[in-house]
């Protein structure tokens, strides 16, 4: 025997599963790029002065089975109490058909944001359904396709109210005192950076305050009271005040739509439509507004347009509002939202339909009525007469009640003076209600559910007559058709087949890191020990979560070279915002709050300037030189010019041009010299892990896209996680939380997300990835990502010029193909190439970012040589097709590129093109053919004829 037992045990087996090319294929690619070894290649590409001598010590790799067992033991420390805490979070019943066929299905969770609508019609339809649910329940005209959570949606509502307000001199925002505390927390954080004054008072006093541009009300208050705000809203609107209302999807099934009462903006959490609490997330927020404000709305909006054949097709509408185009002038910095969770909520509505949803809502309310009746019968006082699912119960001996609840493994809301809060949900049973009677009244309460049920059924007044919904909702056929599991399963599969995800092909999107989301990483997110915890449960019930988060934080600290990590931001854009706030608060602590200039290279991600604007900073653009690098002379000149007011620089590394800039430490030194801080955008961290680190380079703070580098799937546009790493001097200034004390974080700052640890239930994905890869595996992943990019660049450079390279003609983990010379010469554009790739079975690379007229390709380490070669061969074949256009063999107005993509319907129809059917639809052969269901979208038509709700079923046929 030549192998040792340790070798046979092969603890690093997962590394070989995660990294696409095996050792032999890696050597073939190294030969193709004229490099002797991976280490030699990295030595040629990464500046010597920033290379780590040794990879960060995050432990050795574990097998999938060992890592799962280890995590199972950790999560076993969590205590699964029944939580009636409420405050915007409730237990749910996720239908198994949705769990199995969507949440656990890579055809859904590995797709990207639907920028390429032709390969995204399935999830676009599901998102359109989500918008329809929102429109029906809120009674408004326009809805978005989800925001990050309810609290950030409230902050977005405030910002939007100011944008659309006609009261230009007003600078005060009124918040009703019974909104959820975490909502108020996030609103206050956002208001401070915008310079708004937040007034918190009883809603009835909203009219007493002057210079108010917007008011935030909550239809069902945090402690349960249903409010009829119709008269107040009418008076506020007479004063031209913008009215936002926080609402609850399940309550809205029974309650009057806020839009019908005059609200301008309505938002809330869609969590209770089938999405587990997950210790705080991820959850989709819904957001709706009146038609007049549609172009000021934040987030993605799905609209109905037409394709080149005149058929109805879906797309993301009005993208000119968004950060990737408008930069610092964008309505919001929102990029990743919560598509996967919004689609769960929309499918929950489809599966239950209006009748099923009403039955669920009525059952919740009936059990709440029964609980209320029994408590009142025994002499307890309810603080509110009108309620849906939440009771505020006054108790004489609160400590004793809470002790009995704890003994019964039940959580009640405990932060209300002389009272406890109890929120029921769709999982609540009559036995649960009897148990609550015992806790509040003692064992001998003598109450009978059947008797109480008869009483409240005859005379329930807990929802005032004026607040009962009197209109039909979810009348569209899609919500009234798929109620058997067979029909639902087939409907979801029909949507999935329309889309292109990683389970079918490589997605070579530059700056997006579409790597493997391994099955072993995904398994823990559905474990009930992770899924069922309330984010505000006592910390001793979440010791497993705390241990997992602590370990993950420690690993990220070591991988980034920082001193602390804050897990709260629930997207990369939120991470940017949180990091910039830390910088801002740091300057304020030194009596330098005037420092508000943020330097941003011209090549930056659109979120950077949008986030800087949100953080109350002024953006100054730094030029790039002819090689795409930061122009040091321009940087120094602008840093010196703004020395007294310089706050920071936001820089991405490797750069968005796909190059390791040799002068990155000089950049850091210049900014530090003039009193600024260095924010290093973590979007390209997949080219750093194990090789270098932001802290080692000299940065002060970064966000990490766990949904890129650390394997959380993109979910078709979310969820994401954007924790920030900081140096020690910034650690006191990371986000805190008003409800939960974050252990180990000595911060007094406000929150940026609703939950203290953001989307905590997807953190196990990144924990599993790091645990299974270990230090050496993580470094190897970065190395192979760089090798794969250089292999593609080397193979394609003669057909498509590589726009930017570093020394020795190398690129980092992505490369930019310059299509501009081809377009000028032949008339074929980067858009034509992107759409033609669909016929070859590929999602397009990133178009026209960071340079217009280009395609940016990032293969990641997970793609094997065979798939890389398939992509390369497709690009070379397309280049040959362009030559045929150039030669006049195919006219510019009728060729397979400008007509791409081609559908089955087109194949079966009369053929009048200058090229054959075979060339159109089978350019790469017939094996594993992906069929788009629509032709190229008409973007102009879609924005000029905005239609953002469900279309007739005939359009789906």
Curated annotation (Swiss-Prot):
It catalyses: N(6)-[(R)-lipoyl]-L-lysyl-[glycine-cleavage complex H protein] + glycine + H(+) = N(6)-[(R)-S(8)-aminomethyldihydrolipoyl]-L-lysyl-[glycine-cleavage complex H protein] + CO2. One of its GO terms (biological process) is glycine decarboxylation via glycine cleavage system. GO terms for molecular function: glycine binding; glycine dehydrogenase (decarboxylating) activity; pyridoxal phosphate binding. Its cofactor is pyridoxal 5'-phosphate. The keyword Lipid biosynthesis does not apply. Pfam families: GcvP2_C (PF21478), GDC-P (PF02347). Its EC number is 1.4.4.2. Gene3D superfamilies: Aspartate Aminotransferase, domain 1, Type I PLP-dependent aspartate aminotransferase-like (Major domain). InterPro entries: GcvP, GDC-P_C, GDC-P_N, GDC_P, PyrdxlP-dep_Trfase, PyrdxlP-dep_Trfase_major, PyrdxlP-dep_Trfase_small. It comes from the Bacteria. Keywords: Oxidoreductase, Pyridoxal phosphate. GO terms for cellular component: cytosol; glycine cleavage complex. Belongs to the GcvP family. PANTHER family: GLYCINE DEHYDROGENASE (DECARBOXYLATING), GLYCINE DEHYDROGENASE, DECARBOXYLATING. The glycine cleavage system catalyzes the degradation of glycine. The P protein binds the alpha-amino group of glycine through its pyridoxal phosphate cofactor; CO(2) is released and the remaining methylamine moiety is then transferred to the lipoamide cofactor of the H protein. The glycine cleavage system is composed of four proteins: P, T, L and H. This is Glycine dehydrogenase (decarboxylating). It comes from Salmonella arizonae (strain ATCC BAA-731 / CDC346-86 / RSK2980).
């Amino acid at each position: 025997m030549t192998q040792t037992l340790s070798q046979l045990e092969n603890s690093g087996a997962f590394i070989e599963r995660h990294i696409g090319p095996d050792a032999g294929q890696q050597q073939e690619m190294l030969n193709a790029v004229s490099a002797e070894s991976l280490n030699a290649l990295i030595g040629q590409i990464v500046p010597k002065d920033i290379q780590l001598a040794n990879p960060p010590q995050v432990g050795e790799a574990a097998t999938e089975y060992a890592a799962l067992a280890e995590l199972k033991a950790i999560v076993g420390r969590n205590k699964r109490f029944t939580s009636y805490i409420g405050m915007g979070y409730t237990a749910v019943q996720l239908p198994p058909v949705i769990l199995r066929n969507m949440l656990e299905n890579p055809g859904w969770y590995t797709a990207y944001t639907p920028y390429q609508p032709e390969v995204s019609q399935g999830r676009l339809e599901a998102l359109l359904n989500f918008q329809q649910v929102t429109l029906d329940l809120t009674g408004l005209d326009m809805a978005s396709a989800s925001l990050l959570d309810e609290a950030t949606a409230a902050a977005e509502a405030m910002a939007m109210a100011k944008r659309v307000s006609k009261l230009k001199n007003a600078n005060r925002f009124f918040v009703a005192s019974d909104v959820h505390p975490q909502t108020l927390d996030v609103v206050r954080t956002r208001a401070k950076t915008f310079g708004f004054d937040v007034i918190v008072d009883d809603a009835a006093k909203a009219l007493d305050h002057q210079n108010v541009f917007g008011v935030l009300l909550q239809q069902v208050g945090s402690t349960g009271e249903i409010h009829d705000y119709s008269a107040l809203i009418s008076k506020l609107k007479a004063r031209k005040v913008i009215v936002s209302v926080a609402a609850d999807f399940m309550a809205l099934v029974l309650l009057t739509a806020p839009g019908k009462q005059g609200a301008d903006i309505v938002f809330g959490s869609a969590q209770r439509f089938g999405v587990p609490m997950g210790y705080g997330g991820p959850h989709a927020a819904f957001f709706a507004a009146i038609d007049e404000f549609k172009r000021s709305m934040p987030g993605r909006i799905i609209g109905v347009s037409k394709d080149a054949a005149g058929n109805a097709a879906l797309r993301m509408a009005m993208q000119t509002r968004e950060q990737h185009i408008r930069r610092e002038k964008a309505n919001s910095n929102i990029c990743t939202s919560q598509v996967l969770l919004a689609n769960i909520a929309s499918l929950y509505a489809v599966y239950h339909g209006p009748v099923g949803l009403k039955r669920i809502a009525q059952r919740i309310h009936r059990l709440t009525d029964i609980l209320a009746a029994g408590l009142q019968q025994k002499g307890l006082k309810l603080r509110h007469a009108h309620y849906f699912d939440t009771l505020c119960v006054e108790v004489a001996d609160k400590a004793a009640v809470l002790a009995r609840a704890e003994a019964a493994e039940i959580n009640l809301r405990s932060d209300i003076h002389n009272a406890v809060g109890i929120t029921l949900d769709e999982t609540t049973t009559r036995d649960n209600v009897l148990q609550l009677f015992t806790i509040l009244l003692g064992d001998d309460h003598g109450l009978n559910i059947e008797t109480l049920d008869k009483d409240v059924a005859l005379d329930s007044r807990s929802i005032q007559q004026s607040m009962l919904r009197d209109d039909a909702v979810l009348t569209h056929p899609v919500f009234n058709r798929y109620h058997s599991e067979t029909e639902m399963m087939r409907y979801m599969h029909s949507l999935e087949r329309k889309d292109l995800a990683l389970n079918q092909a490589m997605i070579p999107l530059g700056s997006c890191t579409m790597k493997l989301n391994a099955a072993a990483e995904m398994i823990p997110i559905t474990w009930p020990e992770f899924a069922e915890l309330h984010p505000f449960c006592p910390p001793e019930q979440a010791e497993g979560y705390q241990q997992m988060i602590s370990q993950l934080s420690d690993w990220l600290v070591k991988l980034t070279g920082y001193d602390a990590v804050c897990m709260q931001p629930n997207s990369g854009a939120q991470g940017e915002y949180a990091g910039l706030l830390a910088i801002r608060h740091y300057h304020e602590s030194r009596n330098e709050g005037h420092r508000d200039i943020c330097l941003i290279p011209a090549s930056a991600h659109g979120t950077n300037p949008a986030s800087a604007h949100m953080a109350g900073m002024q953006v100054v653009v730094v030029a790039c030189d002819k090689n795409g690098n930061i122009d040091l002379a321009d940087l120094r000149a602008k840093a010196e010019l703004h020395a007294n007011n310089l706050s920071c620089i936001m820089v991405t590394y490797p750069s968005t041009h796909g190059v390791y800039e040799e002068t990155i430490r000089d950049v850091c030194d210049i900014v530090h010299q003039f009193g600024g801080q260095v924010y290093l955008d973590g979007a390209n961290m997949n080219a750093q892990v194990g090789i270098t680190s932001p802290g080692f380079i000299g940065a002060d703070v970064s966000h990490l896209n766990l949904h890129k580098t650390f394997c959380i799937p993109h979910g078709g546009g979310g969820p994401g996680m954007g924790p920030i790493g900081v140096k020690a001097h910034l650690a006191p200034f990371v986000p805190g939380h008003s409800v939960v004390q974050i252990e180990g974080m000595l911060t007094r700052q406000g929150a940026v997300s609703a939950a203290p640890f953001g989307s905590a239930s997807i953190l196990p994905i990144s924990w599993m990835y790091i645990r299974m890869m270990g230090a050496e595996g993580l470094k190897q992943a970065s190395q192979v990502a760089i090798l794969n990019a250089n292999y593609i660049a080397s193979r394609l450079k003669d057909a498509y010029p590589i726009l930017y390279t570093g020394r020795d003609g190398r690129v980092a983990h992505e490369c930019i193909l310059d299509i501009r010379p081809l377009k000028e010469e032949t008339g074929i554009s980067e858009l034509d190439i992107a759409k033609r790739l669909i016929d070859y079975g590929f999602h397009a690379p990133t178009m026209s970012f960071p340079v217009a007229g280009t395609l940016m390709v990032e293969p990641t380490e997970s793609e094997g040589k065979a798939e890389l070669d398939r992509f390369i061969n497709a690009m070379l074949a397309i280049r040959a097709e362009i030559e045929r256009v150039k030669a006049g063999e195919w006219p510019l107005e009728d060729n397979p590129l400008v007509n791409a993509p081609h559908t089955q319907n087109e194949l079966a129809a009369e053929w009048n093109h200058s090229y054959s059917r075979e060339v159109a639809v089978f350019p790469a052969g017939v094996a594993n053919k992906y069929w788009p269901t629509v032709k190229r979208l008409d973007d102009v038509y879609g924005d000029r004829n905005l239609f953002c709700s469900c279309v007739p079923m005939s359009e789906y046929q």
